[in-house]
Amino acid sequence: MSLWSFAVFWFYLASFFVVGTLAAVLVLPFMAASLLFATGVVICGFFSNLSFRSAQLVYDQFVGTLQLTLQHMAEQVPPASDMQQPSGSTIDTGAMLAHTFDSSSYGATTQTGSGPESGPVPELGSEVSASPSPELAALPVAHKRSGRRTGTLASGM
């Protein structure tokens, strides 16, 4: 082995150790910080999942209670087919809608009586016909729902 080869070998070996040491000094702290932050992300993800699951459990427990409460509240609402006047007689809903669409002013209601059962009572006069107006007849007819309830209220948990 020549002297020149020997000097080049030591130069490359020293360069390798210097560059390796500088890289270790500069890179290893960033790698350690990266590992620390990655650990923090994993821990935060774990607690995020844990808090989501606990919130979902609380939500699932109260959904049934809320559905039952809403169902009981809905059962307390009187049917919308007939409206009670304060005198006790009923108003046909179709005639009331026909009056609403036939009248020139849509605010033709009066407030009579007092108490929770009194409300806006339409002024029904001779202009109300038994057949609905063309505007009302053009509206789509909603099919009457059966007595069996479907959907989220009846499905439970």
Swiss-Prot record:
Keyword tags: Membrane, Sporulation, Transmembrane, Transmembrane helix
Signal sequence residues: none
Compositional bias per record (Polar residues), positions renumbered to this chain: 104-115
Membrane topology according to the record: Multi-pass membrane protein
Gene Ontology biological process terms in this record: sporulation resulting in formation of a cellular spore
A matching Pfam family: Osw5
Annotated region (Disordered), positions in chain: 104-157
Transmembrane region(s): 8-28, 30-50
Protein location: Membrane
Cytoplasmic side: 1-7, 51-157
Residue numbers on the Extracellular membrane side: 29
Organism superkingdom: Eukaryota
Free-text function comment from the UniProt entry: Involved in spore wall assembly.
Protein name per its UniProtKB record: Outer spore wall protein 5
Species this protein is from: Eremothecium gossypii (strain ATCC 10895 / CBS 109.51 / FGSC 9923 / NRRL Y-1056) (Yeast)
